[in-house]
């Protein structure tokens, strides 16, 4: 049975970011690194993205935001998916930017 393998060329990734940033001018950009940067390595991709001018990160879940923080990043980290009420305090403690969709999550803050 074949094994899938993927490797990202960070030089090409950085080049692509520079091209995108050149079109955005002064518009802040986030690095969307959910699902381990779609399998490319969230930590490595975020480091490169921040060095190329991105201002923060977006992740799918609180757990992914915790990985960003545990890796030493202090940039803004937006959680795109709705956290469970019991995850709200973790997100707050990790200084993640959390979505709130109802009073249950609001009260959990």
Segments the model singles out, each with a brief description of its role:
Residues 4-7, 12-14, 25-109:
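Active-site-proximal beta-alpha core segment in soluble small-molecule metabolic enzymes
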């Amino acid at each position: 049975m074949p094994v899938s393998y993927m490797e990202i060329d960070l030089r090409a990734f950085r080049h692509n970011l520079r091209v995108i940033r050149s079109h955005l001018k002064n518009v802040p950009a986030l690095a969307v690194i959910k699902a381990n940067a779609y399998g490319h390595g969230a930590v490595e991709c975020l480091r490169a993205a921040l060095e190329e001018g991105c201002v923060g990160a977006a992740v799918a879940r609180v757990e992914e935001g915790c990985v960003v923080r545990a890796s030493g990043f202090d940039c803004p980290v937006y959680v795109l998916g709705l956290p469970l009420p019991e995850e709200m305090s973790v997100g707050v403690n990790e200084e993640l930017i959390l979505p709130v969709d109802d009073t249950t999550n609001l009260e959990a803050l």
